[in-house]
Amino acid sequence: MKKNRLLFRVIILLILCGAVGFTLYQGFFADKEKMQIGKEAPNFVVTDLEGKKIELKDLKGKGVFLNFWGTWCKPCEKEMPYMNELYPKYKEKGVEIIALDADETEIAVKNFVKQYDLKFPVAIDKGTKIIGTYSVGPLPTSFLIDKDGKVVEKIIGEQTKEQLEGYLQKITP
């Protein structure tokens, strides 16, 4: 009876060690697609609220301002009008602004877009897979991607209009 108990405990211990080892492996080594400053931005494909497919690799040759946000996020709400105001000017210069919502309902996101009359592409990161790939923590978080598809900078937190314009100038081709 004691041998069975000991064997059972050893088996449970091995299973736990295996689970911990697998978790550590996944966290540190498995995902080579993670975003790194100075490296090529991980590709993604989303469909915006207008039904248009957006694939990051198709935007090579343009600067990309990639913004992760949420409708509930007050700092996100404050910077959206600045992005909307600057979008036409920088779109003409070869810069795209893409806003990826953090997995909220389509109704909530559409209502927000309508309320602020947003003109730039807005999509929902369903399942937050892209957020994970880009190692996004607090919202808003934005990434500057140059014309060659490389990540130039990661910006965490709300931006003023002046800061945003400076970032857009930085990635203008």
Curated annotation (Swiss-Prot):
Pathway in which the depicted protein is active: Protein modification; cytochrome c assembly
Superkingdom: Bacteria
Disulfide linkage: 73-76
Keywords annotated in UniProt: Cell membrane, Cytochrome c-type biogenesis, Disulfide bond, Membrane, Oxidoreductase, Redox-active center, Signal-anchor, Transmembrane, Transmembrane helix
Transmembrane residue ranges: 10-29
Gene Ontology CC terms, in alphabetical order: plasma membrane
Domain Thioredoxin stretches: 35-173
One example of a Gene Ontology biological process annotation: cytochrome complex assembly
Subcellular location: Cell membrane
GO MF annotation list: antioxidant activity; disulfide oxidoreductase activity
Keyword Disulfide bond applies: yes
Transmembrane helix keyword on record: yes
Chief location category: membrane
Membrane topology: Single-pass type II membrane protein
InterPro entries per the UniProt record, alphabetical: AhpC/TSA, Thiol-dS_OxRdtase_ResA, Thioredoxin-like_sf, Thioredoxin_domain, Thioredoxin_ResA/DsbE_sf
Record family assignment: Belongs to the thioredoxin family. ResA subfamily.
HAMAP family: ResA (MF_01319)
Function description: Thiol-disulfide oxidoreductase which is required in disulfide reduction during c-type cytochrome synthesis. May accept reducing equivalents from CcdA, leading to breakage of disulfide bonds in apocytochrome c; following this reduction heme can be covalently attached.
Record-given protein name: Thiol-disulfide oxidoreductase ResA
Organism: Bacillus cereus (strain ZK / E33L)
